[in-house]
Regions:
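Generic beta-strand/beta-sheet core signal
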Residues: 215, 237-239, 267
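Class I SAM-dependent methyltransferase Rossmann-like catalytic core
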Residues: 24-28, 32-110, 122-130
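A short SAM/SAH-binding and catalytic strip from SAM-dependent methyltransferases
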Residues: 232-247
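Class I S-adenosyl-L-methionine-dependent methyltransferase module
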Residues: 42, 61-62, 91, 108-214, ...
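Structural signal for terminal/edge beta-strands and the immediately following C-terminal loop/tail
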Residues: 285-311
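Non-catalytic accessory regions outside enzyme or core folds
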Residues: 1-41
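C-terminal substrate-binding/active-site "lid" region of AdoMet-derived donor-dependent transferases
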Residues: 243-294
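Short amphipathic alpha-helix with an adjacent loop that forms part of the alpha/beta core around
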Residues: 220-229
């Protein structure tokens, strides 16, 4: 897929119906030969729409108007390029816990959670948040996470979590203003509700910080997993992380995680991990495949806003 095609796909499959601003901006970038040429000089993982838009917003540029966005980006390209080369798409969306919860609640309790690509670790608190699956509510915490669930009997209990750890090449801290500013820049412009969720989840994490370890998902995962307490069910999980990892490392990661005790929850786009005999997704929007120990269970929207259960 060319860089231009990736921006078209992002605009149509991810942003359409969710962020008119990013749909419009993605399609504008896809037609901008000069900007595409600058992006082409970067490694593929550094050309992502979310990363470019987040870096420009962090630097104070506008994303509301494609022309203003282009002017700012071209005028400040050295700073934009530096941000693209040094930062990563670390969207830390606690709403993803809503699609993880049905799987987590059904596992033997208590749980030792280990998130790969944890960012600031906000998805390590599924037991602290509240949830709404249509008319079904569970939990009493903040934030409240809404998920439109189809084909699913929602859980009637929260998981019991006794250990929380995250592995990331660049862990972020909710107590560091610069890190919070980057997390905020990654939230799409119209999504005020997600900004409120970020603040509420950040308060939870700051009051009981998780163990966040800087490291590689293949080389450093076994050592961190070995620190999980005895008597707890180890659960290694990740959401929208492996697309940033070269295919050979994805294969190596899958081999490592399968050899660990406990369970593996993956929540990745269709082309990232191989799955057999999947049903048709519910629509043309981008959906992740939610799987437990390699067995597909559901289609899930990337921010946890909806899921279609088929497992």
């Amino acid at each position: 897929m060319t860089t231009a095609e990736s921006y078209v796909e992002f605009g149509i499959r991810e942003a359409r119906g969710v962020s008119p601003t990013y749909e419009r901006l993605s399609l504008a970038v896809s037609r901008d030969e000069e900007l595409l040429a600058l992006l082409a000089a970067l490694p593929p993982a550094r050309r992502q729409p979310n990363l470019l838009f987040g870096v420009v917003r962090l630097l104070g540029g506008s994303v509301d108007d494609p022309a203003a966005f282009r002017d700012f980006t071209m005028a400040n390209w050295p700073a934009v390029e530096a941000g693209l080369r040094t930062r990563a798409t670390q969207t830390n969306e606690p709403g993803r816990c809503a699609v993880l919860l049905p799987v987590l609640a059904a596992l033997p309790q208590p749980l030792a959670l280990l998130e790969v690509g944890a960012s600031a670790g906000l998805c390590l608190y599924p037991d602290r948040y509240a949830y709404r699956y249509g008319d079904h509510a569970i939990g009493a915490g903040e934030p409240v996470l809404d998920c439109a669930a189809t084909g699913l009997t929602p859980p009637d209990r929260l998981p019991e979590v006794v250990w929380r750890a995250g592995l990331d090449l660049n862990p972020l801290r909710v107590t560091e203003p610069a890190d919070v500013a980057w997390l905020d820049a990654l939230i799409w412009p119209e999504h005020a509700h997600r900004r409120a969720r970020l603040r509420a989840a950040g308060t939870v994490a700051a009051s009981d910080p998780p163990l966040l370890v800087r490291g590689d998902l293949v080389d450093d995962l076994p050592a961190l997993a070995a620190r999980a307490p005895a008597g707890a069910t180890l659960v290694v999980f990740h959401t929208s992380v492996l697309y940033q990892v070269p295919v050979p490392r994805r294969v190596a990661f899958a081999d490592v995680v399968r050899r660990l005790p406990g369970h593996w929850i993956s929540n990745e786009s269709l082309d990232v991990l191989p799955h057999d005999a999947l049903p048709q997704p519910p629509d043309e929007a981008l959906h992740n495949v939610l799987a437990l120990d390699g067995r597909p269970l559901a289609w899930a929207r990337p921010h946890g806003q909806a899921m279609t259960w088929f497992g």
